[in-house]
Curated annotation (Swiss-Prot):
GO CC annotation, single: axon
GO biological process: amino acid transmembrane transport; asparagine transport; glutamine transport
Presence of the UniProt keyword Cell inner membrane in the record: no
Protein's name in the database: Sodium-coupled neutral amino acid transporter 7
Membrane-spanning residues: 46-66, 74-94, 120-140, 168-188, 195-215, 234-256, 272-292, 309-329, 361-381, 385-405, 419-439
Family (UniProt): Belongs to the amino acid/polyamine transporter 2 family.
Compartments, as annotated in UniProt: Lysosome membrane; Cell projection, Axon
Organism: Xenopus laevis
Gene from which the chain derives: slc38a7
UniProt cross-references to Pfam families, sorted A to Z: Aa_trans
Membrane topology, as annotated: Multi-pass membrane protein
Disulphide-bridged cysteine pairs: none
């Protein structure tokens, strides 16, 4: 996830320094010269980047989301309805980026909706990336449990050695691999993350689809529900869908990097990209649900036997993707926090290197320790996705809707046309839907955590 998905796939084809400048707030010394990209992204390249931003860790949770929604028909129908708003939100953001001449999501929100909305957006981006980093640690623990179990030939009833304990393996992996990759001021690992992420997510989809068509004899048959017990059950899948398709934060700099910044062309690009993401997510969701039914785990790979070699390769791919993506997500969150810090302390960006280094190390260590500690005590990625999926609704619905409303209200017309009223009403509808999704999913997630 990218910062947009902020999931496994979080990479653009730019170097780390350029990405840092694009992610920082306007007050962090981002001059027009530094923000101007050499060349431009082709339409095909833009499609790949948007797909890369959308596909991510949410893929593992889609079969469980299909089960929670009450079956295949309900889940696919919900996806198609939400995709209309997801695609329109991407187009609205590009239109607003043209209107205010900004190149990042938070700058567009700040430029169109004002300072308060911009600060709120930056805070939510930081919280969203923080939550996704927690999900990454949980994914590492899930996959290592299965891989170590296969190597040691242990069963569910076997005692787990101390060196194979989940908390120990997550901690060691984090301290030895993730923390050193997260400390540098600039990150070079992201140039490899894009290829690994796309390859990993596609491989997981292929494995799940193939296992559904030619099931392993060791996988027992499971009950498949054809309808939900209540029409309200369909909302159980909303957080996963929002988390999976959320690429809106990444989309603004992608649009700004295009060779020809045309709204109509951009509409075609994001439609194609979302169709590709729909095929991948739906393929994984449908086949994973048909394989395991109501017994599917929150992470679909956990439902497969430990000794399945093809699935073991998929687990190794996912671990590698997460190891390269956590530093990128932390880097994005740190850039936003750094911008907020410099703005509210009225400091100039050109400070002493030693002071900046101490603050960066302190920020990184605190971020790392908090995400690690929370991941050790959260049982599965479903708990995290159910919470940050509500935040994803803010980036998909609320902020694009607010931008559209402010943009329309800023236009001076003596007589408002029907199209003006239609667009204003659409913005209000987006904000209303986003607020409902955020409130409903967040409240339910907190309630489940407190009760369970």
């Amino acid at each position: 996830m990218s910062l947009g998905n902020v999931g496994i796939n979080a990479d653009y084809s730019w170097d780390a320094g350029e990405r840092a400048r694009l992610l920082q707030s306007p007050s962090v010394g981002t001059s027009p010269e530094l923000r101007r990209l050499a060349g431009g992204t082709s339409p095909a390249g833009a499609v790949f980047i948007v797909v890369n931003a959308a596909l991510g860790a949410g893929l593992l949770n889609f079969p469980a989301a299909f089960n929670a929604a009450g079956g295949i028909t309900a889940a696919i129908s919900l996806q198609l309805v939400l995709l209309l708003f997801i695609i329109s939100g991407l187009v609205i953001l590009a239109h607003c980026a043209d209107a205010c001449s900004e190149r990042t999501y938070q700058e567009v929100v700040r430029g169109v909706c004002g300072r308060t909305a911009g600060v709120l957006c930056e805070v939510l981006i930081a919280v969203y990336t923080f939550g996704t980093c927690i999900a990454f640690f949980i994914i590492i623990g899930d996959q290592l449990d299965k891989l170590l179990g296969a190597m040691m030939h242990t069963t569910a009833e076997s005692p787990v050695p101390w060196y194979a304990d989940r908390k120990f393996t997550i901690s060691v992996t984090g301290v030895l691999l993730i923390l050193p990759l997260s400390l540098p001021r600039e990150i070079s690992v992201q140039r490899y993350a894009s290829f690994l992420s796309v390859l990993g997510t596609c491989y997981v989809t292929v494995v799940v689809v193939v296992r559904c068509i030619w099931p392993d004899t060791t996988i027992p048959s499971h009950e498949i529900s054809s309808s939900s017990s209540s029409w309200l059950a369909v909302f159980n899948a909303v957080p996963t869908i929002c988390f999976g398709y959320q690429c809106h934060v990444s989309s603004v700099p992608v649009y700004g990097s295009m060779q020809q910044q045309d709204i109509r062309r951009w509409g075609y690009i994001v439609t194609i990209a979302m169709f590709i993401a729909l095929c991948v997510y739906t393929g994984t969701g449908v086949c994973g649900f048909l394989l395991f039914g109501s017994d599917v785990d929150q992470d679909v790979l956990l439902s497969f036997p430990s000794d399945d070699i093809a699935v073991a390769v998929a687990r190794a791919f996912i671990i590698l993707c997460v190891l390269t993506s956590y530093p990128i997500l932390h880097y994005c969150g740190r850039a936003v926090l750094e911008g907020l810090w410099l703005r509210f302390t009225s400091q100039e960006p050109g400070e002493e290197p030693s002071k900046e280094r101490r603050r960066r190390v302190l920020q990184t260590v605190i971020w790392f320790l908090l995400t690690l500690l929370l991941a050790l005590f959260i049982p599965d990625i479903g708990r995290v996705i159910s919470l940050i999926g509500g935040l994803a609704a803010c980036f998909i619905f609320i902020f694009p809707g607010l931008c559209l409303i402010h943009l329309k209200l800023s236009e001076i017309h003596e007589h408002k046309s029907k199209s003006w009223w239609a667009l204003l009403s659409y913005g209000v509808i987006m904000v209303t839907i986003g607020t409902f999704i955020f409130g409903q999913t967040t409240t339910k997630a907190i309630f489940v955590d407190l009760v369970g």
